[in-house]
């Protein structure tokens, strides 16, 4: 947020949360009060660790808050009870803030309450006092546009009794006028439209944006039943109303009230149109000293609270013709036409009435062209003949009947050529549509060709590999496989070539050791072992699966071994092996028997 939104800043001592007021320390922080009303940001109270900190410690939202001076001990610590303490209470937390002096506390309380819209009375009185001493061209903000037109709601009669009641009503409304805030809250505003019995009033804007608004905010509206040259009554409106009033350039004047029932329909000023829709519901108070009301004024009605009408539809124009006597308020012998009028007229807007009067004819022609472009029913005939431009070779008339001058309507100032309201020409029966080459479509996507699965390799199932290991035992030895040193767990594994080589080397080493080392075993009767022969077969099946069918099977590389690591395998004679084992067992039995 910019520094221009800063309202007040200074050092304050901040309280901890309410449940920790007595236990936790009160910190001295740099507080900044920011108003975000003009920039669209919320009104906040920020506090920083010091002056030069860029990021605030906390941002307190003042959208729903109350502020007041602290009275009494309450929850305040003893060291701060005699100081200048004020309280800011929000929806989430209550802050006890300690100021250094009473003047600082007054400034903070007044600034926060002003931001939180708690000082409407003082602000309204100050704004009214400053408004009476400042000219209309030096008003500081568009907030003063809130003090625009104020119209009495009671009826004005000719006798003095009712006149006094009107003055009393105006005095009461003047007292209500002091309570208005500096700025207009748009959510409280209402837009309305004058009905046929209401009196249009000319608002005198008192803000410095009046001049620019009067020139740029002329909202064009289609109005039926208006006099083509109604601006003649706008140039000298005061001669018919018998209202004597000057137009000073410095002092802002009240609104000029137009009479609704002044002699003759030609003197009915601006009452023949629902004119001057004001975007603000509050209006300027009419002071009796500044404006002398005409004797023919019967009543002043406040604007209706009905929303603005929707844009007209084609059926709206025919219905408007029937309601024309209601809108105009009097019957006119002249042929009704279409004209354009601004929604609001101010003092600066009257300077442009002359140019606006000259543009009525061209604007009416432009609206006729717009109606033709929308194929709306035309209420008038083309009064102004236009010269038809030279027809181009590529120009195709929209209607088969009529000449080129009738087919080409009047061109407006912005070179807009509307369409003709006539029907389109009929096409010949033998006319065929142009051929369409669908292969030239830019976003057409061809289907991808089907996958060619002929070159893809399939999963080849290999036959199971069966390896049979036979572990024979001598009938005379009756040895268990544990005593023979055969590890059965190795038989169930799936060794590779290197592991098989290592296992065979280890088995040979174990066999050599078992010939030397003599183990002691308990004696078992030879009769019980003679009937046992231990022979088992172990079948191991291997199935090679290749799950990646597209890629070839990986080639297993054999490790190259040196001459020292290479082992030459020989076929083992089973008879010699059994003889060695039986000899070993006999030696063992003899040693055990000697012990």
From Swiss-Prot:
Q: Which UniProt keywords apply?
A: Phosphoprotein
Q: Where is the composition biased (Acidic residues)?
A: 496-513
Membrane-crossing segments per the record: none
Task: Tell me if Phosphoprotein is a UniProt keyword of this record.
Answer: yes
* Tissue specificity field: Highly expressed in spleen and thymus and weakly in brain, heart, lung, kidney, uterus, and embryonic stem cells. Also expressed in myeloid and macrophage cell lines.
Q: Does the keyword Phosphoprotein apply?
A: yes
Q: How does it assemble?
A: Interacts with PIK3R/p85, SHP2 and GRAP2/MONA. May interact with Grb2.
Q: Which residues carry this modification: Phosphoserine?
A: 346, 480
Q: Name the source organism.
A: Mus musculus (Mouse)
Instruction: Give the protein family.
Output: Belongs to the GAB family.
**Domain annotation PH: ranges:** 5-117
Residue stretches of biased makeup (Polar residues): 317-331, 454-463
Originating gene: Gab3
Taxonomic superkingdom: Eukaryota
The coiled-coil segments of this chain are none
Fill in the PTM field for this protein.
Phosphorylated on tyrosine residue(s) after macrophage colony-stimulating factor (M-CSF) receptor stimulation.
Protein's name in the database: GRB2-associated-binding protein 3
What's one GO-annotated cellular component? cytosol
Chain segments carrying region Disordered: 295-339, 389-408, 418-463, 493-513
Any GO BP annotation: macrophage differentiation
């Amino acid at each position: 947020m910019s520094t221009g939104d800063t309202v007040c800043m200074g050092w304050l001592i901040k309280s901890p949360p309410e449940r920790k007021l007595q236990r936790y320390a009160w910190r001295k922080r740099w507080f900044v009060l920011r108003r975000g009303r003009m920039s669209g940001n919320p009104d906040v109270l920020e506090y920083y660790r010091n002056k030069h900190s860029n990021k605030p410690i906390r941002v307190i939202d003042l959208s729903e808050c109350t502020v007041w001076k602290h009275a009494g001990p309450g929850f305040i610590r003893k060291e701060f009870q005699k100081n200048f303490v004020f309280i800011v209470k929000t929806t989430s937390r209550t802050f006890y803030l300690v100021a250094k002096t009473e003047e600082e506390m007054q400034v903070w309380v007044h600034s926060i309450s002003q931001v939180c819209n708690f000082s409407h009375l003082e602000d309204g009185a100050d704004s009214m006092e400053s408004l009476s001493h400042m000219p209309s061209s030096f008003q500081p903000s568009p907030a003063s546009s809130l003090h625009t037109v104020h119209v009495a709601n009671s009826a004005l009669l000719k006798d003095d009794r009712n006149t006094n009641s009107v003055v009393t009503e105006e005095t009461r409304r003047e007292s209500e006028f002091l309570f208005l805030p500096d700025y207009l809250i748009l959510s409280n505003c209402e837009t309305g439209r004058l009905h046929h019995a209401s009196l249009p009033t000319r608002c005198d804007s008192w803000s410095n944006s009046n001049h620019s608004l009067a020139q740029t905010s002329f909202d064009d509206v289609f109005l039926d039943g208006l006099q083509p040259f109604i601006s003649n009554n706008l140039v000298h409106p005061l001669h018919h109303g018998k209202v004597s009033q000057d137009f000073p350039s410095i002092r802002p004047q009240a609104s000029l009230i137009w009479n609704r029932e002044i002699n003759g329909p030609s003197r009915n000023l601006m009452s023949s149109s629902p004119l001057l829709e004001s975007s603000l519901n509050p209006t300027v108070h009419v002071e009796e000293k500044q404006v002398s009301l005409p004797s023919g004024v019967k009543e002043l009605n406040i604007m209706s609270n009905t929303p603005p009408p929707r844009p007209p539809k084609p059926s709206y124009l025919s219905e408007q013709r029937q309601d024309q006597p209601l809108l105009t308020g009097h019957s006119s012998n002249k042929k009704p036409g279409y004209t354009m009028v601004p929604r609001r007229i101010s003092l600066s807007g009257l300077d442009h009435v002359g140019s606006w009067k000259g543009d009525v004819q061209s604007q009416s022609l432009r609206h006729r062209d717009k109606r033709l472009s929308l194929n709306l029913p035309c209420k008038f005939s083309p009064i102004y003949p236009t010269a038809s431009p030279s027809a181009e070779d590529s120009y195709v008339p929209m209607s088969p009947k009529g000449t080129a001058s009738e087919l080409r309507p009047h061109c407006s100032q912005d070179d807009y050529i509307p369409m003709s309201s006539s029907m389109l020409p009929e096409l010949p029966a033998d006319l065929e549509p142009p051929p369409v080459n669908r292969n030239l479509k830019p976003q057409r996507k061809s289907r991808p060709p089907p996958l060619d699965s002929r070159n893809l390799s399939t999963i080849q199932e290999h036959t199971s590999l069966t390896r049979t290991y036979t572990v024979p035992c001598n009938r005379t030895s009756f040895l268990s496989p544990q005593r023979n040193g055969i590890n059965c767990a190795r038989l169930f594994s799936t060794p590779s070539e290197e592991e098989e080589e290592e296992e065979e080397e280890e088995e040979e080493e174990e066999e050599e050791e078992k010939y030397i080392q003599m183990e002691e075993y308990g004696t078992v009767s030879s009769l019980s072992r003679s009937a046992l022969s231990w022979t088992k077969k172990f079948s191991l099946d291997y199935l090679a699966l290749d799950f990646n069918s597209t890629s070839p099977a990986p080639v297993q590389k054999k490790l190259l071994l040196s001459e020292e690591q290479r082992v030459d395998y020989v076929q083992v004679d089973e008879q010699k092996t059994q003889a060695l084992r039986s000899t070993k067992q006999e030696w063992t039995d003899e040693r055990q028997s000697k012990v």
